[in-house]
From Swiss-Prot:
Its main location: cytoplasm. The lineage of its organism: Bacteria, Pseudomonadati, Pseudomonadota, Alphaproteobacteria, Rhodobacterales. This is Arginine--tRNA ligase. It comes from Jannaschia sp. (strain CCS1). Its EC number is 6.1.1.19. It catalyses: tRNA(Arg) + L-arginine + ATP = L-arginyl-tRNA(Arg) + AMP + diphosphate. CDD domains: ArgRS_core (cd00671).
Amino acid sequence: MTLFAEIRDTVLAAIDTLVADNVLPSGLEMRAVTVEPPRDASHGDMATNAAMVLAKPAGMKPRDIAEALAAKLADDARIDTVDVAGPGFLNLRLSGDVWRGVIADALTQGEAYGRSKIGAGKRVNVEYVSANPTGPLHVGHTRGAVFGDALASLLDVAGYDVTREYYINDGGAQVDVLVRSVYLRYLEAHGQDVAFEDGTYPGDYLIDVGQALKDKVGDAFVDKGEQFWLAEIREFATEQMMDLIRKDLALLGVEMDVFYSEKSLYGTGRIEAAIDDLRGKGLIYEGYLEPPKGKTPEDWEPREQTLFKSTEHGDDVDRPVMKSDGSWTYFAPDIAYHFDKVSRGFDELIDVFGADHGGYVKRMKAAVSALSGGDVPLDVKLTQLVKLRRGDEELKMSKRAGTFVTLADVVEMVGADVTRFHMLTRKNDAPLDFDVDKVREQSKDNPVWYVQYAHARIKSVLRKAEEAGMSPDPANLNAVNDPAELALAAKIAEYPRLIEIAAKGNEPHRVAFYLFDLASDFHGLWNKGNAETHLRFFQDDDPSATSGKLCLISAVAIVISNGLGILGVTPVDQM
């Protein structure tokens, strides 16, 4: 339980006492009562809306309830002061012992500090990246990979049982384009001059694949019609691309639990089973769709089609699952894939898509709702575009890929840790500027450096203390008593609450934002110590005070390390 949850329980207990004293009526609904940090830190350590929430159902003025609550809460030893503000908000200021207790908890729990049980072991499938197996991952895939991986780690820390999954789109026409492109590189490996036409993949990454194919089959396919080699090369080319993609993911430290092939859905009865499930629920019918306004989607045709009643589950229009010629639409295997997820017993599904898939969200949610009977929620997180630049110059091309900057290019330029952290400095659905020069600056304007610098500074102080024969000792925590020090401890106390909020909203960027704020508070206290010597973490003439202050900064380092672990970033001990 977080400290904020503990204080909320204290507020609820005080309300129960007021009910028992007949100050408040019984049967009041408490769910909307909150305890959280005030918007203005000068107002106190925590604020509660209890009086505002209870006023109407109790038939009382908010301030009257607030004053009665304040009198009860003032008796709690953990609370120094209770102030009634505005129409009836309560601002609480906690005792120094509470904040020193937070420091002690962080030291005791170490890597476990901030871990939560709110997930209660629920099984969550997080599908992310899922790029077509046609080439190396590009900078847009990088954002989805980082976001999805950090989200999976966040949910794990919050007590969920997480499966990380990659859906291999190896059943569509784009793989045929890959095969034809590989064939051209294969001919090139045999010494032929080839021309890459529009619609093929010209990147240098296929040169080695063409050579590998030559080594495998010799000249068996040279100058043969594609009916002789298209199917034969398809599996080979897909495997080669997935090996490349796995290597790209490894550069970022991303490891998947499951790679699921779209092709495995065809010819196995899985698509038919999913559609039959919907048919059995009365959600499949034969009919016509009105032509859509604007651009005509690929799955629309002016003929009778097999349609899914997705409008009964929140979609704007019903969706085709089978064309008039009897072939499946693109949507059908996606339905089957999510039917498989539901059948595997997951309690919640999360899909991480690029922003260009925004139009797919409602139909996918409708499908999962129908397939699970509304029991399995699907949250679709869209990652917006990344604009890669070097100063004023936008970086668009990569010789390796032929048309785009790759994940490997980005990691080579700035490193995996910088890449991962910076990809989380904006909410996933906001566009992101990624300046490869800016992210290497050593300044407060570079969040990843600023957070890492805080951790390195702390480790430097701890090494100095160790050389002097001193170490953190919670028995001396009374030395942490200055308001600036206690404010830093209060920031540490926010971390467990932050984890729960971020996990409930599937928002790992909140962790990055919090770490920057924590680092800023730490650096601010460090700078204060330059002028006010009693705030310095290393007190040459007072070993006991030093050991107490070392506890404070050790707790900060623990939180930074734990938070960076969620983001997939390695904390540095020196810079």
